[in-house]
Amino acid sequence: MQWTTPSYTDLRFGFEITMYIANR
């Protein structure tokens, strides 16, 4: 799965940060 959509990348990045903070 390789999406080059900036919005998708931003969403995925934000999701990763959210999960990181939630797993702290």
Curated annotation (Swiss-Prot):
The keyword Chaperone appears for this protein: no
Protein's UniProt keywords contain Cell inner membrane: no
InterPro entries on file: PQQ_synth_PqqA
Keywords: PQQ biosynthesis
Pathway(s) of this molecule: Cofactor biosynthesis; pyrroloquinoline quinone biosynthesis
Pfam family, one: PqqA
GO biological process: pyrroloquinoline quinone biosynthetic process
Cross-link (Pyrroloquinoline quinone (Glu-Tyr)): 16-20
Family recorded in the similarity comment: Belongs to the PqqA family.
Family annotation (NCBIfam families): PQQ_syn_pqqA (TIGR02107)
Task of the protein: Required for coenzyme pyrroloquinoline quinone (PQQ) biosynthesis. PQQ is probably formed by cross-linking a specific glutamate to a specific tyrosine residue and excising these residues from the peptide.
Protein name, per record: Coenzyme PQQ synthesis protein A
